[in-house]
From Swiss-Prot:
Reported induction: By vanillate.
Recorded GO MF terms: carboxy-lyase activity; flavin prenyltransferase activity
Lineage: Bacteria, Bacillati, Actinomycetota, Actinomycetes, Kitasatosporales
SUPFAM superfamilies hit by this protein: Homo-oligomeric flavin-containing Cys decarboxylases, HFCD
EC number(s) reported in the record: 2.5.1.129
The name this protein goes by in its record: Probable UbiX-like flavin prenyltransferase
Further information: It is not known, if phenolic acid decarboxylase forms a complex composed of VdcB, VdcC and VdcD. The term subunit is often used in reference to the operon, however there is no experimental evidence to prove the existence of the complex.
Pfam (any one): Flavoprotein
Membrane-traversing stretches: none
PANTHER family on file: FLAVIN PRENYLTRANSFERASE, FLAVIN PRENYLTRANSFERASE PAD1, MITOCHONDRIAL
Binding site for FMN: G9, A10, T11, S36, S87, M88, K89, T90, R122
Family designation: Belongs to the UbiX/PAD1 family. YclB subfamily.
Record's function text: Involved in the non-oxidative decarboxylation and detoxification of phenolic derivatives under both aerobic and anaerobic conditions. Flavin prenyltransferase that catalyzes the synthesis of the prenylated FMN cofactor (prenyl-FMN) for phenolic acid decarboxylase.
Enzyme class, first EC level, given as a word: transferase
Amino acid sequence: MRLVVGMTGATGAPFGVRLLENLRQLPGVETHLVLSRWARTTIEMETGLSVAEVSALADVTHHPEDQGATISSGSFRTDGMVIVPCSMKTLAGIRTGYAEGLVARAADVVLKERRRLVLVPRETPLSEIHLQNMLELARMGVQLVPPMPAFYNNPQTVDDIVDHVVARILDQFDLPAPAARRWAGMRAARAAARSFGDAA
């Protein structure tokens, strides 16, 4: 499998980094990474990692302005793309076909080739414009996976919350997520809640 991973300047860089770490552990998955200019700043602020360290998690890293990159052409076969986190600017550009920069261009290619496109939009609150853009993209077949925390699995740390969101992203591509703590029914949930309460 060959996946394109885009990261933009919206807050939520830990989700993108954790996704890359997971994908790197999966045999047969080739990753192509594009970091927007502001993603580079956000990564350093939110993760403490350098751009070089994050880039090293991918098989191939493309410059954000390289419109001649392989992933800017539909003839370069991929299985899809995920943008995590996805800024509202990038989301709006994808919705309107305004492919400024390689992140948006690669997404435009995935759309026109009818491949799987997953966006992880990071903004709150959402305006009517944001919601309209997301609705139109959903109608085009784009998967929108907002990084919303789940509490039925009793997360103990921020890492637990990040892992859950990343597992849901991996699910969109039918890829395994070993760290996922999945819903196992009400009985298991109640037992976990009691255990959590006892520990507290």
